[in-house]
Design a protein with these regions (language model features):
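Glycan-recognition and catalytic cores of secretory/periplasmic carbohydrate-active enzymes
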Residues: 1-204
Length: 204
């Protein structure tokens, strides 16, 4: 009742306030720490997810944009999962690895905050789902808002688990870019996401 002033009577418990000690779930978390997260990061390396960010930091009209328009989110979600583990199993090596990945991600961000490698790595010939201009195909397949939603979720988890702002600041800059360019104001565009996820990020 006392929290009704927030608009909703129930507040979620921060995941950083929960420690799983049960043997069953403890085994699952340990498997995630030892197998799943390292495998997911290795797949990001092997399948060119990181290369996309490197290419976006050094765009060229000779780069062939392949894969899927939402490939960036594999990096964001893996960092999110790793962040959940860091609060239960502090790991300096893992934290350092995440920081190194975030250096690559930050380098791919455009000056105004826009971060969508499927366009930025080759603005003249972006991914076929991206459209010729920003947000042009948000309602279809570009996944620009979808990518942002996963980025925000990962950035919040990383900040809550580590207290570091390096990922959070990247996400805020992209969110600010969207707020400037999308809306009903003069010079803005009205766009509706074709795939939900940004809404989940807003809830957080």
């Amino acid at each position: 009742v006392k929290n009704q002033s927030h608009g909703y009577p129930i507040d979620p418990v921060p995941f950083t306030s929960v420690k799983v000690t049960d043997s069953f779930w403890g085994q699952r978390l340990n498997a995630s720490r030892e197998v799943t997260i390292p495998l997911a990061f290795s797949k990001c390396e092997e399948t060119g997810r990181y290369t996309n960010f490197v290419n976006a930091a050094h765009p060229s009209d000779t780069i062939k944009v392949g894969g899927l328009a939402f490939d960036d989110t594999d990096v964001y979600k893996t960092i999110e999962g790793a962040s959940y583990l860091l609060q239960t199993y502090p790991d300096k090596k893992l934290a350092k690895y995440i920081d190194s990945v975030l250096v690559i991600v930050a380098a791919a961000q455009e000056p105004d905050g826009y971060l969508y490698t499927s366009r930025t790595m080759n603005p003249k010939h972006p991914h076929e789902w991206a459209g010729s201009k920003r947000w042009e195909k948000v309602e279809e397949l570009s996944h620009e808002f979808y990518n942002l939603g996963h980025m925000v979720e990962g950035a919040i988890a990383h900040y809550q688990a580590t207290g570091k702002r390096n990922f959070l600041d990247i996400a805020i800059r992209y969110a600010d870019c969207v707020c400037r360019e999308i809306g009903t104001g003069e010079g803005q565009q009205i766009r509706v996401p074709g795939h939900q996820i940004a809404e989940m990020a807003l809830a957080k």
